[in-house]
Amino acid sequence: MGFPLSAIEPGDVTIRQAMPEDAAIMVRFLRELAEYQATTEYFHATEEAILRDGFGENREFEALIAVSEGKPVGLATFNRTYSTWEGSVGLVIQDLFVAEEARGKQVGFHLVRDVARIAEERGATHLQLNVVHANPARNFYARVGFNHMDDLLTYRLSHDKMTALLDL
C-alpha cells in the first residue's frame, strides 16, 4: 500500500496493513468491539468471512492493524462508498477498535489518521463512520473532527426481512 505507516512513539506502536494471518485477531477484536458496544446479538463474523471478504479476489473491505511490542492492539476496517449527491468517492470506517491496554495512547487517532491518508491518496472527498448511540468513543470522534449529522438516520433491512420483501 502506498501510504507511510504511523509510528506513535519510536518503537512503541506502528500501524500496518492487515494480512490474511491477522484474520483470527481481527475476529477477536471485532467480537470485543461488539461486547464493548453491547451489540453482540448482531455479531456473526468468522475467520472464513474475514479471509474471503478482506483478502480474497473480490475484496469488500480493507483493514489496518496497530501493533505494539509485536502484539496487535488495534484495528480499523474500512471500505469505499460513493455519494451521488456530492458526486464523489469516500471511505467509510466500519470498525475502529483499540484493546483496553492500549486506550489513551493515541492508537485510535493514528488508525483514523491513516485511513484518512488512504482516502486522500485515493481522491476521496470524505470519510464517514456509523456509531452506536451508547458508544463512549463518540467524544473521541468529535475531537478528531467528525461531525454528527443530525439530519441523517440509518435504517437497515435484515436478511430475513429483505427476503420477505421479495415475496411481496
Each model region followed by its residue ranges:
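Conserved GNAT acetyl-CoA-binding A-motif
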Residues: 119-130
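A short, internal acetyl-CoA/4′-phosphopantetheine-binding micro-motif in the GNAT/acyltransferase core
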Residues: 96-103
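A short beta-loop-alpha structural element at the N-terminal edge
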Residues: 14-28
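Conserved active-site alpha-helix within GNAT-family acetyltransferase domains
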Residues: 109, 121, 133-151, 157
